[in-house]
């Protein structure tokens, strides 16, 4: 696993061991970031795993990323990857589940330019996260949510509007923005 583009292009990333982890394939990651064109501001990498999506965003110019994963080993891998690339100052890393993390973020009154959702497949975790992101108004007015999920899953987009949807074999990605009725 590696960084695809930007300041840290081709740098290797440590990944998680085990059957329950599923790192984002390079072609999916490249497709996501090519469709975004540019990244900037503040990002949230929820269900971060190895941190590959948030680190890719930092490499491509995002100012800061908050990484969240409930797995202790994942948090250690994220911290190691950030340290290796000297990105610690541009990041915050938390061991927490998505529900509690989103509630804590809401209390900090933070809004994000980009939110990456790449949870374990087929657990309805994206639906729960999108519901809270909408309820807590965590996405900036022109922000984008990037969801990666199994093509077997049906995603409830709540108040968000679909910008683009891509299919990569068994993986689908969805880019969402605030709907017009959220103004």
Q: Can you annotate each of these PLM segments?
A:
Residues 1-183:
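Class I S-adenosyl-L-methionine-dependent methyltransferase catalytic core
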């Amino acid at each position: 696993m590696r960084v695809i583009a930007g300041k840290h292009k081709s740098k290797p990333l440590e990944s998680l061991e085990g059957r329950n982890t599923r790192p984002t394939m390079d072609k999916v990651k490249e497709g996501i970031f090519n469709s975004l064109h540019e990244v900037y501001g503040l990002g949230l990498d929820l269900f971060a795993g190895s941190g590959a999506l948030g680190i890719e965003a930092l490499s491509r110019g995002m100012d800061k990323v908050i990484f969240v994963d409930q797995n202790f080993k994942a948090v250690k891998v994220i911290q190691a990857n950030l340290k290796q690339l000297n990105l610690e100052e541009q990041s915050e890393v938390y061991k927490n589940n998505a529900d509690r993390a989103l509630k804590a973020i809401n209390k900090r009154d933070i809004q994000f330019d980009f939110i990456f959702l790449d949870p374990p497949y087929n657990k309805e975790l994206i639906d729960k996260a999108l519901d809270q992101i909408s309820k807590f108004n965590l996405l900036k007015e022109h922000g984008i949510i990037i969801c990666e999920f199994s093509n077997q899953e049906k995603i409830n987009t709540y108040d968000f509007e679909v910008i683009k949807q891509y299919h990569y074999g068994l993986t689908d990605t969805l880019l969402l923005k605030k709907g017009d009725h959220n103004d």
